[in-house]
């Protein structure tokens, strides 16, 4: 089963996990893997389309707002305005989707004894 989301001239297609990756000069197939190793989605994206559409679709499928995830490729953050061509992505490249974790250690949590 595959679903397609089309917004303007940008197209993002999500394919089932067992589909074979097909090479296309105008599109690239990207795998997005969540923190749990079992969960991954395959997207067929135009090479010149901003990755925001893919990010929104992935997070919508997970039921979480897109800005709560950080998308990484080889440890480098991918922003919503990047395109696969700008990042020189190839068919089958894997993108990691990590939940944003914010923590801090501030002065109010430190107690000194004199």
From Swiss-Prot:
Cellular component, GO, one term: cytoplasm
Stretch list, region Disordered: 1-20
Main location: nucleus
Lineage top rank: taxon: Eukaryota
Keywords recorded for this protein, A-Z: Cytoplasm, Isopeptide bond, Nucleus, Ubl conjugation pathway
Cellular localization per UniProt: Nucleus; Cytoplasm
Family: Belongs to the ubiquitin family. SUMO subfamily.
Protein name: Putative small ubiquitin-related modifier 4
Lineage: Eukaryota, Viridiplantae, Streptophyta, Embryophyta, Tracheophyta
């Amino acid at each position: 089963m595959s679903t397609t989301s089309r917004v303007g001239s940008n197209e993002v297609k999500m394919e089932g996990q067992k589909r074979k990756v097909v090479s296309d000069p105008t599109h690239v197939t990207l795998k997005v893997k969540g923190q749990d190793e079992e969960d991954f989605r395959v997207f067929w994206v135009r090479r010149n389309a901003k990755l925001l559409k893919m990010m929104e679709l992935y997070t919508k499928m997970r039921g979480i707002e897109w800005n709560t995830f950080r998308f990484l490729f080889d440890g480098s953050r991918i922003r919503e305005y990047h395109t696969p061509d700008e990042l020189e992505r190839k068919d089958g490249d894997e993108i990691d989707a990590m939940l944003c974790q914010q923590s801090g250690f501030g002065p109010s949590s430190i107690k000194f004894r004199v």
